[in-house]
Design a protein with these regions (language model features):
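Short capping segments at the starts of secondary-structure elements
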Residues: 41-46
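A short acidic, leucine-rich amphipathic alpha-helix
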Residues: 49-55, 66
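Non-DNA-binding regulatory cores of transcription-related proteins
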Residues: 76-163
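N-terminal leader segment of winged-helix/HTH proteins
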Residues: 1-26
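Pre-recognition alpha-helix immediately N-terminal to the DNA-recognition helix
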Residues: 32-37
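Basic amphipathic alpha-helical segments that dock to polyanions
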Residues: 66-76
């Protein structure tokens, strides 16, 4: 697992350096550290979670700086923002097309790689006034942990109502 994380970090760092050169952006220590923290995670962290990961190594960094850097990553295409109107935005270093499963109870976001979902673009004839550039699908439901907790709670409620 550590080697895999290291490989992801190296790939993202090289991609970042290339994109920064093309866009004329400085490769600051803040950007590198935040990118490393994001690439090391596979749980789609919030700004607060990335901030907690880096605050010791980047003394004096603010949540606002972390937010701005993550938004910069999204705008230059080296990260994706996963928005959910019911919870905080989350960020993903994996920019290849994939979809998500979002738990409505705890907010956990899980990657869903299903090639059958990658060909759902509507027929071009129906899109006369719109060009689709990209898309992702989010399925909302309960993760296994919350589903189990919910089932246990329901059993307890049933057993309480039966006595």
């Amino acid at each position: 697992m550590k080697n895999n994380v290291r490989n992801i970090r190296e790939i993202k760092r090289k991609e970042f350096e290339t994109v920064c050169r093309h866009k004329g952006l400085a490769m600051t220590i803040q950007r590198r550290t935040i990118l490393d923290a994001l690439a090391a995670r596979n749980d789609h962290p919030t700004v607060d979670q990335v901030y907690e990961d880096i605050k010791e190594s980047l003394k004096g960094v603010s949540r606002t700086t972390v937010y701005r850097v993550l938004e910069t990553f999204v705008s230059i295409g080296i990260a994706r923002k996963i928005s959910n109107p019911e919870s905080k935005a989350r960020f993903d270093a994996d920019t290849k097309r994939h979809h998500h499963l979002t738990c409505i109870s705890c907010g956990k976001v899980i990657d869903l790689h299903d090639p059958t979902l990658d060909n759902l673009v509507p027929d071009a004839d129906t899109l006369t006034e719109f060009d689709i550039l990209d898309y992702s699908i989010t399925f909302n439901g309960l993760c296994s942990c919350c589903r189990q907790a919910s089932a246990q709670s329901a059993e307890k409620d049933r057993s309480c109502s039966e006595s």
